[in-house]
UniProtKB/Swiss-Prot annotation:
Record's GO cellular component terms: cytoplasm; cytosol; Nem1-Spo7 phosphatase complex; nuclear envelope; nuclear membrane
GO biological process: lipid metabolic process; positive regulation of triglyceride biosynthetic process; protein localization to nucleus
Kinase recorded as keyword: no
Protein name: Nuclear envelope phosphatase-regulatory subunit 1
Membrane topology annotation: Multi-pass membrane protein
Subunit structure: Interacts with CTDNEP1; the complex dephosphorylates LPIN1 and LPIN2.
Keywords: Acetylation, Cytoplasm, Lipid metabolism, Membrane, Nucleus, Transmembrane, Transmembrane helix
Tissue specificity remark: Muscle specific with lower expression in other metabolic tissues.
Length: 125
């Protein structure tokens, strides 16, 4: 394989990698927004739950029953984590990190957008 073919292969790989990472961005943004909204709802509900003087006087489950906003948002947040939202919000970073691991064997790397970074060849002495 000559250097021209190698350059074309690298360009094709880079183009496909950047395209793939770029296509993940909208979905990642939506997952991040969902996580932020549910986290803020949970924090707000937790604050209201904690400052309620009735919470200290009743049992734990009764206090949760008295604060359905907190209970539902907390269950939703836990459900999202079980569904893997923590992986979905960082999916492009995971892909880039895995590519960096593989590309390191070939003295290359890539940035978070998928652009290839060619490293100088190590000098063998």
């Amino acid at each position: 394989m000559n250097s021209l073919e190698q350059a074309e292969d690298l360009k094709a790989f880079e183009r496909r990698l950047t395209e793939y990472i770029h296509c993940l961005q909208p979905a990642t943004g939506r997952w991040r927004m969902l996580l932020i909204v549910v986290s803020v709802c949970t924090a707000t509900g937790a604050w209201n739950w904690l400052i309620d003087p009735e919470t200290q006087k009743v049992s734990f489950f009764t206090s949760l029953w008295n604060h359905p906003f907190f209970t539902i948002s907390c269950i939703t947040l836990i459900g999202l984590f079980f569904a893997g939202i923590h992986k979905r919000v960082v999916a492009p970073s995971i892909i880039a990190a895995r590519c960096r691991t593989v590309l390191a064997e070939y003295n290359m790397s890539c940035d978070d957008t998928g652009k290839l970074i060619l490293k100088p060849r190590p000098h063998v002495q």
